[in-house]
Amino acid sequence: MAALLGRDLLSLADLTPTELQELLQLATQLKSQQLKLRCNKVLGLLFSKASTRTRVSFTVAMYQLGGQVIDLNPNVTQVSRGEPVQDTARVLERYLDVLAIRTFEQQELATFAEYAKIPVINALTDLEHPCQILADLLTAQECFDTISGLTLTYVGDGNNVANSLMLGCALAGMNVRIATPSGYEPNPQVVAQAQAIADGKTEILLTNDPELATKGASVLYTDVWASMGQEAEANDRFPIFQPYQISEKLLSLAEPNAIVLHCLPAHRGEEITEEVIEGSQSRVWQQAENRLHVQKALLASILGAE
């Protein structure tokens, strides 16, 4: 996929609809076809936030492509002692071929990308989680064959996952509904970006009514009510978000063949019930596996593989 060769992925808005579809197609191919990088490459993981799926799936993806991985814990690098991001970026570019960053501020990610002359991948920020949404779209595509025209409903906190879902669905030609409590809506700038991508051809609905949002949806999605860094707010958020739990009752309002997604980790009994996450409509484990395949496709496209 020559179009992404050497490029950053800081946001799903960096992709065109065609590039998104080509990435999903390549991810599907890589489930049964082996590719190798054109020469031995090194991926650096610079993660300031805890990670299970993102860390392991990026590591395995790079190994399966024939590359190597260095796990750069910020706490044992000079970043933790105040070395400027721009200095760190200009050093790491001389050792690495690609850098995946998981951090709090989107601006820190953007600064790395500005100063490092190697590709930089957003492995999660407080604003966006693009790699997760690539896996979500691949999962929906596997379940419904075609995703254009489908409706995805997200219920819960208008966080980084909700932001990236709006962009991803707009690129994929899907309708997206975001149901949040008042005051917890997605980032307004990302909403505007998604609306510009959709260009009136698909629906982007923001509502405080989870039942309205769920009616007729083919994909029902949720995430934790308090993201990393918001743990102190968890007790205050619980009563506010309780009406936004994905339960069997809420799921019954969706299409009969609707699937349920959750980016994990899940707090059973909070944003989703045990019955739903373990139920017949849950595709959560397929979704988690697909992190490996979409990130392998992304690395192969950015670094070049054959």
From Swiss-Prot:
Which superkingdom heads the taxonomic lineage of this protein's source? Bacteria
Specify one Pfam family.
OTCace_N
Task: Give the matching InterPro entries.
Answer: Asp/Orn_carbamoyltranf_P-bd, Asp/Orn_carbamoylTrfase, Asp/Orn_carbamoylTrfase_sf, Asp_carbamoyltransf_Asp/Orn-bd, Orn/put_carbamltrans, OTCase_ArgI
**Location(s) in or outside the cell:** Cytoplasm
**PROSITE patterns, A to Z:** CARBAMOYLTRANSFERASE
Described by its record, this protein's role is as follows: Reversibly catalyzes the transfer of the carbamoyl group from carbamoyl phosphate (CP) to the N(epsilon) atom of ornithine (ORN) to produce L-citrulline.
Q: Could you tell me the keywords of this UniProt record?
A: Amino-acid biosynthesis, Arginine biosynthesis, Cytoplasm, Transferase
Enzyme group, top EC level?
transferase
- For this entry, the protein name equals Ornithine carbamoyltransferase
Offer an example of a GO molecular function term for this protein.
ornithine carbamoyltransferase activity
The metabolic or biological pathway listed in the UniProt record of this protein is:
Amino-acid biosynthesis; L-arginine biosynthesis; L-arginine from L-ornithine and carbamoyl phosphate: step 1/3
Gene Ontology CC: cytoplasm
Reactions performed catalytically? carbamoyl phosphate + L-ornithine = L-citrulline + phosphate + H(+)
Q: Name one GO biological process term.
A: arginine biosynthetic process via ornithine
Where do the annotations place carbamoyl phosphate binding?
51-54, 78, 102, 129-132, 263-264, 291
Family per record: Belongs to the aspartate/ornithine carbamoyltransferase superfamily. OTCase family.
Question: What EC number(s) has UniProt assigned to this enzyme?
Answer: 2.1.3.3
**Which species is this record about?**
Trichormus variabilis (strain ATCC 29413 / PCC 7937)
- Binding-site residues, L-ornithine: 160, 223, 227-228
